[in-house]
């Protein structure tokens, strides 16, 4: 039952054979690996924004601003994988729903976001504890769905994309911003960056040699390329699918539309 404006919903996904890659591949993540991933993500909460700012060389703010520009006043907006609310606090003038599988992330997000929206004279956001693959919300509800550095954490990316397609209104748009991997060559440079600079930054900030980013680097290693996910989106039914790197090349932005009926 909903509590404090928050809906909780979870399901168990079917495991596939990814034993040689520790439970990861471009299409998704096995249950055991995903459960550990969520635990590691929750461990990032105290330093989430600080580490992300340093590891993106300060471009995280601009990336979020770029994605927010796709939301117009009065729209119904869903953020899938809202985390601690770093993106959501900057969206103004919309009817906002924040979804995340982590109760701890939603707790932090709600505390930050409710205060900001109250100060702006806006209605409170809605909060849903659920996975992207099973969104407990009606069909054809949202004008925009945003995924900010959460898409690579989906258990089943095609199913997640299908659920987002379902809850989008006809003519609605999905915008994803996540790790940059334009092609396999670009991915090699990304792995080096994630395996050296990001690890060093995380260790300094957290003062912990076993910091969560050491484990989270796996999500990038097994993340797919632009062409892989563009194909997946078209298979689901999206049109106008586009992907491009965002300066300075550490992140990618995908855009895709649900066709008008």
Show the residue positions of the predicted features.
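Core SAM-dependent methyltransferase catalytic element
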Residues: 230, 236-261
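Class I SAM-dependent methyltransferase SAM/SAH-binding core
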Residues: 78-134
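N-terminal, positively charged/glycine-rich alpha-helical extensions of SAM-dependent methyltransferases
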Residues: 11-47
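A short SAM/SAH-binding and catalytic strip from SAM-dependent methyltransferases
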Residues: 144-156
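A short glycine-rich, Lys/Arg-flanked "PGG" loop and its adjoining helix->strand segment in the class I
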Residues: 158-173
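Conserved alpha-helix/loop element of class I SAM-dependent methyltransferases that forms part
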Residues: 56-74
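A short acidic, Gly/Pro-enriched loop at the edge of an enzyme's catalytic core
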Residues: 133-145
């Amino acid at each position: 039952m909903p509590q404090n404006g928050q809906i909780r919903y979870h399901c168990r996904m079917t495991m596939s054979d990814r034993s040689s890659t520790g439970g990861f591949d471009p299409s998704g993540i096995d249950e055991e690996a995903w459960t550990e991933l969520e635990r590691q993500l929750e461990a990032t909460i105290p330093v989430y924004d600080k580490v992300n700012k340093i590891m993106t060389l300060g471009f995280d703010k601009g990336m979020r601003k770029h994605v927010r520009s796709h939301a117009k006043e009065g729209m119904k907006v869903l953020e899938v994988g809202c985390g601690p609310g770093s993106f959501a606090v900057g969206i103004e003038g919309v009817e906002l729903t924040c979804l995340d599988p982590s109760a701890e992330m939603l707790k932090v997000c709600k505390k930050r976001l409710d205060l900001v929206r109250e100060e702006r004279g806006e209605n409170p956001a809605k909060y849903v504890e659920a996975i992207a693959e099973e969104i407990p919300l009606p069909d054809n509800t949202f004008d925009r769905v945003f995924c900010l550095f959460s898409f690579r954490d989906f258990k089943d990316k095609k199913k997640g994309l299908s659920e987002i397609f379902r809850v989008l209104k006809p003519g609605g748009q999905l915008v994803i911003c996540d790790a940059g991997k334009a092609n396999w060559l670009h991915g090699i440079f990304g792995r080096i960056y994630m395996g050296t600079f990001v690890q060093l930054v995380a260790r300094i900030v957290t003062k912990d040699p076993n910091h969560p980013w050491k484990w989270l680097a796996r999500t990038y290693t097994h993340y797919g390329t632009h062409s892989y996910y563009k194909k997946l989106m078209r298979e689901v039914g999206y049109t106008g699918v586009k992907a491009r790197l965002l300066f300075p090349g550490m992140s990618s932005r995908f855009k895709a539309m649900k066709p008008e009926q």
